[in-house]
Amino acid sequence: GELIMSEVKMLTAPVPNVPWQERPQGPQNGAPIWRYSENPIIGRNPLKGVARIFNSAVMPYGDAFIGVFRGEQTNGIPYIYLGHSKDAIHWDFEENKIPFVDENGEPFMPVYAYDPRLVKVEDTYYIIWCQDFYGAAIGMAKTTDFKTFTRIENPFLPFNRNAVLFPRKINGNFMMLSRPSDSGHTPFGDIFLSESPDLVYWGKHRHVMGKGSEWWESLKIGGGAAPIETSEGWLLFYHGVSGTCNGYVYSIGGAILDIDNPSIVKYRCENFLLTPEEWYEERGFVPNVCFPCATIHDSASGKIAIYYGAADSYVGLAFTKLDEIVDYIKTNSVVTSADTEIGRR
């Protein structure tokens, strides 16, 4: 389509020390996203007892950065580790797993924990991950100081994962995207929206969007980074999966959701934004994976840094500018009727 030029702004706080690298010279193919030249930013054996860190979430904290990281232990079981950084590129990890406690202050250790997201709503930080609750299910915890991590009761029934909390309440309620599934490595999946007054009781479930007719996301999709509030709507980076004759391929897609009712998809990009191309995305424990979990973004400059897991083995970093990525999504948008349905015939 003809390029749409937007006067779009982020409705978020400035982050002047957002990690950034200018776009490389030369022709650009596809979306206006480019990789950090020193990728991967986290390599193998990043700390004692952990073989790989990948699908992980980071955010500004004070004048530095903090993150929750999926660490695959040397026994193969995933857990969540805390990390600190001055520049959001070079990370120091705490050797011990995050010590969750229940609401009575008693230790609560999930059987496993993976693919965390980290979102601040008002004055509290929330970690959302996938854990075992008679199958893959959503785990949640809250902290105000990154010292005490209080687990919140199971928000949803199994089987569900890829839960992403919105960074502010909408109409007084917490809002969360999730991806219900079956009991295995799901051969299907759509993104749904649920809301809650208290993070305990969830309801008003709405369908947001299904897998795409485009082949890159024709098997299943799932939420990625916490949505970014903009003057055009909620900017969502998500993952889409293609089923090939030789396994799954995970790419990064983009959509813009209605600001007041995020179950309505305003724009959804027909093309992938980033797909496995580099060695660290194509080769690894699970080949051909780009799995977005977080962004750091600066409202003053429009800079967006996207953090993604690569091949279930590394953490990659990519960059884009707000106006360019919104223009690209709008210019190449396809929205189907299924993207706005609430289940009424």
Enumerate the predicted regions with their spans:
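C-terminal substrate/ligand-recognition segments
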Residues: 293, 297
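Catalytic core of Fe(II)/2-oxoglutarate
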Residues: 225
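Beta-rich carbohydrate-recognition and catalytic domains
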Residues: 3-111, 119-219, 228-288, 299-303, ...
